[in-house]
Amino acid sequence: LEIIRDEELEKFTKELTNELLTDTNLNLEDINFYFINNKEINAFVTGGKNIFVNTGLITQADDYREYQAVIAHELSHIIGGHIFNTSAELKNLSNKALPVYLLGIIGIFAGSADTAISSIMLGQASVQDGFTYYSRNQEASADQAAINLMCSNKINASYLLSFLEKLDRKTLDSVSNENYYRSTHPPIDSRKEWINISLKNKECEFENTQILQEKFNLLKSKLIAFTHSKQEVTAIYRGDSNVDLYANAIISYLSGDHSVSLEILNRLINREPNNPYFRELLGEIYFAKGDFDSAIINQSIAMELINEPSDLYFMMIGSYLITLEDQISKNDGIKNLKKSIFINP
């Protein structure tokens, strides 16, 4: 897995998550998000309170509430204690599997290879079916809980449905009925049916928050620019909006066209002088050009604009400072790197 770090991505995700945590037993600080550089639509929870999100989930969404709906679903697994229940169920199922597997081994030594292999396969299938049923119940429960989380916090939960429809189009031609049967998730059509029924019984048609949608659009363009080819990016982002300019500034930077990238970013900063992420990227490009002083100035401005401690930003400015020749700057750089480690050991 290629785990990526990005302040804009992390902060926006936490902002969406925080909206969902009212009247739950979870605190935002307890949840760890990890972002995987992968174009597939996916997110999952592992032991504890760790949520993994593929970048493809964000780049293929059209509305921030689709992303928020998936977060709500994963939070519901945590709130429901599904990860711990799953561990116990796996242990229980492994105990059931042992005698069936031994029956297969005995058959081999008795000279009945076909019978033995059939027994092993039957044993594996029966155990898998037991876990499949168990997991599908958890997924259905998480869908229902996600709807409740969204509606109770005045977020339109129909976007869980629109996300599933998007996922359905992606998987329709690639997943067989047999794979659906073995899948730990219920078939998407079944999930959509349950969600539709739930939504009919709730008043959940809330308007979107325009500021969040604008933030999402910028973040999406950034991720697409960093994870797709130049041809793909320029085909998608051909206009003069902030979203278009952001993507083109990044793809120009990645292509080595630093002067073009700097010109575009300065236009963006004139339009949105309080956006810290434009300043962050500007500093990164100056650093790549070898203009360390300008890199430090812009990263310092970015840190002032986010107005909260960031381990990632402390690490970045610390790295910039230690490249300077004077000892005072190097010492300041080390201090910032220590702050980064203190926040995120």
Describe every region a protein language model picked out.
Residues L1-E7, K11, F33, Q128-G130, ...:
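Extracytoplasmic and endomembrane cell-envelope/extracellular-matrix remodeling and assembly machinery
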Residues E29-N32, A88-K91, N95, I117-S119, ...:
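Acidic/histidine metal-binding catalytic segments
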Residues F35-K49:
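Catalytic zinc-binding patch centered on the HExxH motif and its immediate surroundings
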Residues V53, A69-H77, G81-H82, A142:
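Active-site recognition of the HExxH zinc-binding catalytic motif
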Residues T55-A69, Y134:
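Short pre-active-site segment immediately N-terminal to the catalytic Zn-binding motif
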Residues R65, L75-N92, A110:
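Catalytic Zn2+-binding segment of zinc metalloproteases
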Residues G80, Y253, F287, L321-L324:
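Specific register positions within alpha-helical solenoid repeats of the TPR/Sel1-like families, i.e.
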Residues N95-D114, S118-G130:
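Membrane-active amphipathic alpha-helices enriched in small hydrophobic residues
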